[in-house]
């Protein structure tokens, strides 16, 4: 059994660690609430844009308009993956779940004879892609907790330009997929994979009761609005990923703090037992000495 002094030192060390994890839990809780507010603040604009895109896409399909971002390519041999991860760790299994999902996606695509390029948003995802030797076309790191839309645009531009045919009819990607953390609730954040390009018609297409009038023309509005729609979709995914990161970190630090408290209780019990054993031994030695003197 360790000495009482060593146990006291361990108790002090664990208590100090518990203070750190408690502080990180409180900071993450505050950042999570702010991230949730950011998601809610952008939702009205995103919802209205979604409604307009639903109506506009339906009209475009009915009118025979073929926008390159709406049209699937005849064959799929080159795929891009937009991978959104946190820049930092200490957020439970969130990073490992995302990187495992990315690895499964890449393996599945390669098994179908497709090449995969990655657009990484977040340091953890970028580092993972470089570590496994996968092709990295673009990266964005250090976005922070409340990134402006302009900081996200390079990733969206890379995806749009890679999917859209150039003047010669050539393009870099046949499909683009998005992998990010879906914020279900404070306790649950899970990887979410979906096709990003070509743009699919919103599920509410034709459901709106508003009769929109487009100026100067429906085609011109579609040309301008469709890239904005893609950018907003990516921006919303990033904001949701940030909320997931802080929620996962808050829960991880809460669990760490609870474990620290439990460890302190166990160490305190061990310390008390060691102290009791030392006192009992000392009393026994005194009693034995007194008995020897009386004889």
Curated annotation (Swiss-Prot):
UniProt cross-references to Gene3D superfamilies, sorted A to Z: 3.40.1380.10, ATP synthase, gamma subunit, helix hairpin domain (1.10.287.80)
One GO location term (cellular component): proton-transporting ATP synthase complex
GO biological process, one term: proton motive force-driven plasma membrane ATP synthesis
Membrane topology: Peripheral membrane protein
CDD domains: F1-ATPase_gamma
Keyword flag Lyase: no
Places the protein is found: Cell membrane
Superkingdom assignment: Bacteria
GO molecular function annotations of the record: ATP binding; proton-transporting ATP synthase activity, rotational mechanism
A Pfam family recorded for this sequence: ATP-synt
Primary location class: membrane
Keywords, alphabetical: ATP synthesis, Cell membrane, CF(1), Hydrogen ion transport, Ion transport, Membrane, Transport
Family classification: Belongs to the ATPase gamma chain family.
NCBIfam families per UniProt: ATPsyn_F1gamma (TIGR01146), PRK14111.1 (NF010709)
Subunit organization: F-type ATPases have 2 components, CF(1) - the catalytic core - and CF(0) - the membrane proton channel. CF(1) has five subunits: alpha(3), beta(3), gamma(1), delta(1), epsilon(1). CF(0) has three main subunits: a, b and c.
Function summary: Produces ATP from ADP in the presence of a proton gradient across the membrane. The gamma chain is believed to be important in regulating ATPase activity and the flow of protons through the CF(0) complex.
Protein name, entry field: ATP synthase gamma chain
Organism whose genome encodes this protein: Herpetosiphon aurantiacus (strain ATCC 23779 / DSM 785 / 114-95)
């Amino acid at each position: 059994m360790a000495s009482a002094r060593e146990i006291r030192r361990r108790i002090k060390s664990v208590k100090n660690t518990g203070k750190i994890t408690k502080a990180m839990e409180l900071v993450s809780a505050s950042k999570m609430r702010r991230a949730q507010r950011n998601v809610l603040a952008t939702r009205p604009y995103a919802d209205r844009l979604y409604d307009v895109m639903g109506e506009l896409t339906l009209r475009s399909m009915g009118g025979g308009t073929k926008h390159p971002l709406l049209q699937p390519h005849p064959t799929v041999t080159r795929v891009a993956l937009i991978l959104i991860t946190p820049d930092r760790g200490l957020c439970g299994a969130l990073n490992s779940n995302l990187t495992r999902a990315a690895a499964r996606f890449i393996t599945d695509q390669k098994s179908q004879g497709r090449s995969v390029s990655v657009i990484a948003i977040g340091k953890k995802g970028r580092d993972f892609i470089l570590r496994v030797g996968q092709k990295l076309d673009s990266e964005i790191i250090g976005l922070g907790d409340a990134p402006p839309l302009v900081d996200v645009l390079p990733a969206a531009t890379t995806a749009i330009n890679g999917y859209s045919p150039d003047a010669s009819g050539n393009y870099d990607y046949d499909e683009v997929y998005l992998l990010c953390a879906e914020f279900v609730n404070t306790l649950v954040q899970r990887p979410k994979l979906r096709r990003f390009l070509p743009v699919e018609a919103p599920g509410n297409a034709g459901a709106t009761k508003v009769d929109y009038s487009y100026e100067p023309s429906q085609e011109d509005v579609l040309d301008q609005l469709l890239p904005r729609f893609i950018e907003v979709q990516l921006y919303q995914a990033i904001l949701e990923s940030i909320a997931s990161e802080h929620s996962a970190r808050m829960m991880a630090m809460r669990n760490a703090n609870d474990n620290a408290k439990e460890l302190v209780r166990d160490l305190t019990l061990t310390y008390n037992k060691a102290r009791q054993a030392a006192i009992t031994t000392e009393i026994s030695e005194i009693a034995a000495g007194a008995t020897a003197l009386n004889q």
